[in-house]
Amino acid sequence: MKINEQYHNLNLLENITYEFLGRDGETHEETESILVEHMMDVYVNERLTMKLVCIPEHLAELVLGRLFTEEIISSADDVEQIYICEFGKRARVILSKNKSGQPHEENEDYVSPTPTCCTGNRVLNDYFITDQPLMPVTPIPWKKQWIFDLADCFANGTPLHSQTWATHSCFLACNGELLFQCEDIGRHNALDKAIGYALRHNIDLKKCVVYSSGRIPTDMAIKAIRAGIPVLASKASPSAEAVAMAKEYQLTLICAARR
């Protein structure tokens, strides 16, 4: 797999001046850094397949992880090349010949439901989706200290969240070692970035623990299960349906993991 990233140091923040209003009626101007929403179109074999709203860093990881969790690819070997333009606005993905894609019977474009906290993300067509059944993950032994350490990493602060309080974050670890951390507007994007990082660097997700800063509804659980991640931890709470899904597919789900 070849990855060609032409973008460098795109703006993540923008300074704005606003009027502050206090409870005592006092008003004054303040300046603050706020997060930038970045739009990126993803073309797979020259076909517009996704529109993503994100922050413009770790874009190749985001694309790779999203292709994986949307079942467009089953491994990094299915990708021949990922190209990200200099503005980070367009990603071009070339699949390997054995994943060239066959049209479904009607092959009509559609817009999928938008996941919560991933503002504006859309899957535009199902041309490459394989509809593979969800398979149980293989549980692994894990240590509670690993989870405490990841909760501490989050509590110690991530760069953009510390400045804006406007991002979710995700941490990828294996055998108690932190391998990668990232931030994004939405928790789904952050999880996809962590998954994409593992795929890009040949890390076996079946041996990994992932920690998310966000809630765990079913769509987050499905991403972890599809990726084969055995342990998913979160600072926040799960939904009842996500708990039921974790039991059914043998996903170890650890929530309210915070310092």
Summary of predicted features, one role per range:
Residues 2-175, 180-181:
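Intrinsically disordered, low-complexity regions enriched in acidic/Ser/Thr/Pro/Gln residues
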Residues 164, 185-188:
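Alpha-helix initiation and capping sites
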Residues 187-259:
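Feature captures the catalytic cores and cofactor-binding loops of soluble hydro-lyases/lyases
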Residues 175, 183-185, 215:
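Histidine- and/or cysteine-centered catalytic micro-motif in compact active-site loops
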